[in-house]
Amino acid sequence: MHMQLRKRKRVDYSGRNQTSDPPSTTTAAVPSIIVPKKRKVVAQNMVSPAIRATTTTLGTSNIIIPKPLQRPKFHNSASLSSPDDDPEKISVLEVQKNLSNLIKRQQRLFYKDIHKPTLAGLKNFEMLRLPNDLKLLQNIVNLLYSFEQLNSDSKTRPVTTSKLKASSQAHSDKLKKMLAERKPPFSHPSHSGTAYHNDIIHEIANLHSINLVDLINLEVYNNNCHTNNTALQTTANSLTLNSIIKKLDKPILKERNNSLVWPHKSRFKAKRNQPSPGQSLINNTDITLYNDV
């Protein structure tokens, strides 16, 4: 099967008109119309207002005065009281007295036979009365009494603080006097020196309110047993240290758990297996420097 090409039809383009611009048409000039200016008609017996010339300077009326924002007031300004009319102060004792009288009066009038919530009171002024209303009022009276007691204590507190300051000053003066009047020991230097230090310790304990009951026995022992013999003095010091250590270790021993194994350290160190140089080289060859992935 062979394909056959179809012949193209011949077209003649010579008979067509070529494109051309449209002919230009000139129009005659239209004369412009002149509109006459309107004349200003001035009526008789009529004075035109004078126009004020604008100036660049601002007058007092053009100055803007900034004012802060304020919340609106919902009360009448005319009914405001003057600052001289201060509210009357009522003492706490007077309020407490009035509440106590009110409790007695209410108990007599309305709460005498009330065991459940009821409406009681004067005519057209009944109120719901509860059985525990009087208890609540009595609690308020008790709170007012405690409040008054706290106020009275706070007023007297500066006096107590001044007394404490005076006592601390007296203690400090006494310590300074003891340090200034320190005299050298005569026959028993250790004994007199110990007594001197004990006096200073007692003064400091009194100054800071420290209880020294646990140290009285040690103080008496040191005062009676100290002699010129250094061996006895060393023994006394060791006994003092041991007694103090026992008192300090006693609460620690109570908390100690004896069931735990005491840590043990071996006397001999374990020998480390040191590889030979050749073996270390062989082992190092297996180390991968880069990831295969």
Curated annotation (Swiss-Prot):
Residues 15-28 have a biased composition (Polar residues). GO terms for cellular component: nucleus. Residues 1-10 have a biased composition (Basic residues). It comes from the Eukaryota. Keywords: Nucleus. It comes from Saccharomyces cerevisiae (strain ATCC 204508 / S288c) (Baker's yeast). Residues 1-28 are annotated as: Disordered. This is Uncharacterized protein YPL068C. It is found in: Nucleus.
